[in-house]
Amino acid sequence: MVANFDDRDGYIWFNGKYVDWSDAKLHVLSHALHYGSSVFEGERVYNKKIFKLEEHTERLLYSASRMDMVIPYSKNEINDACNSIIHKNSIVDGYVRPIAWRGAEMMGVSAQSTKINFAIAIWEWPSYFDPEERLKGIRLEISRWKRPSPETIPCDTKAAGLYMICTLSKHEAERKGYADSLMLDYQGNVSEATGANIFFIKDNEIHTPTPDC
């Protein structure tokens, strides 16, 4: 049985220092829990190295800026922390999750005085899809929920609030026997899966949807 994510061994980088996994907690009245005010990244680790770490950190800082948040650490500090947590937890192949969120200093839509917290966790996480399903080909349902227009929210960010439609779509697809759901954008164009990018190769070139779809 897989251990719950709140009950594991290891360390989490939490606001500038390492804490035991079980001690990395936040208050129930944190703004992020009520209003979705958090941004994050998902970074794969192969043989103790993070794939495209620079690009991930740049996108994280961009997402935070677009969501009116200032992460209190520099790009280099974040990169160093992401690299160090691999060795701190003795992970060879895994997944790194940096996340920034608004704290509990204010409750309400306005949150300009909230503290921006920052944490980095790492764990061993195999392929997003079952290996047998990958060999057969992933079965996707077309979701009835669409990615929002860029005029409604900064949808070129990796913001937590944007993932609610992905959760709804994934649940619905799984209940129908599909592995995942294909998300379309507000114009009906192919966007992504619920938690994975979609691309195809044509004439030796990689084609993938634009970030604002």
Kindly give the residue locations of the regions a language model identified:
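Helix-start/capping segments and mature chain N-termini
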Residues: 1-73, 77-84, 109-213
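Short, acidic/charged, Gly/Pro-enriched secondary-structure junctions
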Residues: 79-93, 97-106, 123
